[in-house]
C-alpha cells in the first residue's frame, strides 16, 4: 500500500498518519472479521537513482527512451515514499498484526543490482520491440513479469518468517520454466542443462508452468 495513496488525485489520495492509516485499520478489521490473517506490507521501492530534489522521478516514469530531459542517474537509490512507509508498520504494531518491510527488502535488492542491472526488474522496454508501445517505455515504478516473480519470492519468504503458520505451505524451486517469460527458462531442456555438475548428487527441483513444451 502507498504508491497510489501518494497521488494528488482526490479519488486516491490519503494522508499518512490520517486517512491512510484509517484505511489500513479497516483492511485489518474486515480481514479478521472474515477469519483471515492480515499481513501488512509497506511499499516496494521505485527504481529511483535520481536525487530527491529532482521531481521528475517522484511520479511513474513513462518517458520515451532517450528523451532530452531525462535526468542523469547516480549509484544511490533514493526514497520516494516518505511518511507512507511508516503507516503500515505503525498500524501493524497498534493492532497486533504481522508486518513485512517490503521497502527495505526491495531497496536492498535494487540497490544491490545497481542502476543498470535493476532495469531488468521494471518495465523498461526498448523501442520497436513491443507493438503496443512502439516508442518504448522507461517505467521505474511497475515491475515486469520477471521482476514480479523475483519480488513475489522475497515477499513469500518474508511472510513465512513473520507468520510461521504459513511457512509449511511455501514451496521452493531451483528453476522455473514458463512460456510467458516469467520463469528462468523457456524450455524444460534449458532448465535441465542449467543444473551444474556440483549438484548432481543433490535434488534439483524444477517448476514447469502450464503450457505445451
Residue positions per predicted region:
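Alpha-helical cap/lid subdomain in secreted, periplasmic
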Residues: 1-145, 149, 153-164
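Residues within well-ordered beta-strands of beta-sheet-rich folds
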Residues: 37, 207-209
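Acidic helix-start/capping segments at beta-turn-to-alpha-helix junctions
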Residues: 48, 209-211
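Low-complexity, Pro/Thr/Ser/Gly/Ala-rich linker/spacer regions in secreted
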Residues: 167-174
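Acidic Gly/Asp/Thr-rich repetitive segments characteristic of extracellular carbohydrate-active
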Residues: 175-207
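Extracellular beta-strand scaffolds
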Residues: 183, 212-213
Amino acid at each position: 500500500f502507498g504508491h497510489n495513496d501518494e497521488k494528488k488525485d482526490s479519488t486516491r489520495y490519503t494522508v499518512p498518519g490520517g486517512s491512510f492509516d484509517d484505511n489500513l485499520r479497516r483492511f485489518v478489521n474486515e480481514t479478521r472479521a472474515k477469519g483471515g490473517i492480515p499481513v501488512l506490507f509497506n511499499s516496494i521501492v521505485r527504481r529511483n537513482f535520481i536525487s530527491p530534489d529532482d521531481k521528475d522521478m517522484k511520479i511513474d516514469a513513462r518517458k520515451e527512451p532517450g528523451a532530452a530531459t531525462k535526468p542523469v542517474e547516480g549509484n544511490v537509490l533514493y526514497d520516494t515514499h516518505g511518511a507512507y512507509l511508516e503507516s503500515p508498520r505503525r498500524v501493524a504494531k497498534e493492532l497486533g498484526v504481522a508486518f513485512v518491510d517490503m521497502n527495505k527488502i526491495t531497496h536492498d535488492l535494487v540497490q544491490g543490482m545497481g542502476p543498470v542491472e535493476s532495469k531488468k526488474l521494471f518495465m523498461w522496454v526498448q523501442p520497436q520491440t513491443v507493438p503496443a508501445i512502439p516508442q518504448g517505455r522507461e517505467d521505474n515504478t511497475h515491475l515486469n513479469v520477471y521482476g514480479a516473480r523475483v519480488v513475489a519470492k522475497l515477499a513469500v519468504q518474508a511472510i513465512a518468517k513473520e507468520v510461521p503458520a504459513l511457512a509449511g505451505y511455501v514451496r521452493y524451486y531451483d528453476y522455473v520454466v514458463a512460456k510467458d517469460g516469467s520463469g528462468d527458462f523457456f524450455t524444460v531442456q534449458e532448465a535441465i542443462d542449467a543444473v551444474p555438475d556440483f549438484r548432481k548428487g543433490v535434488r534439483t527441483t524444477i517448476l514447469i508452468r502450464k503450457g505445451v513444451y
